[in-house]
């Protein structure tokens, strides 16, 4: 399973376009890949560009915080079968990965509309 998150320079999970890096943790290989966030500097279509990137990287799960996705990017992610680990707030990425089994218990294929960016 490949689990992705957008992270800040300080290592906190953030909304898709709001962190300069994307980290993908591969549970089978037990390794982490770090990429520059392709939507970080865009003016438009930021979230959709990131979803396209995540799909190109064969991501299975996205760790998300409220307003990580907009309705368009969420629709694309859902249609392509991405699953979500929903956090109530930004947390350190390492903390989530260290407790991954706990977070995977709440793995979902949907995000409530009130958590999408307007």
Feature roles, as predicted:
Residues 1-45, 56, 82-118:
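Non-catalytic interface/targeting segments
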Residues 46-50:
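Well-ordered alpha-helical segments embedded in enzymatic catalytic cores
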Residues 53-90:
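Mid-chain, well-packed structural core segment of small domains
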């Amino acid at each position: 399973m490949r689990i992705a998150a957008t992270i800040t320079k300080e290592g906190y999970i953030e909304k898709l376009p709001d962190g300069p890096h994307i980290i993908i943790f591969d549970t089978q290989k037990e390794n982490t890949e770090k990429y520059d966030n392709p939507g970080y500097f865009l003016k438009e279509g930021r979230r959709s560009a990131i979803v396209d990137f995540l799909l190109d990287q064969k991501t299975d799960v996205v760790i998300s915080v409220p307003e990580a996705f907009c309705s368009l990017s969420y629709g694309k992610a859902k249609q392509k079968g991405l699953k979500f680990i929903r956090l109530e707030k930004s947390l350190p990425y390492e903390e989530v990965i260290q407790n991954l089994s706990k977070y995977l218990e709440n793995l979902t294929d949907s995000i409530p509309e009130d958590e999408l960016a307007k």
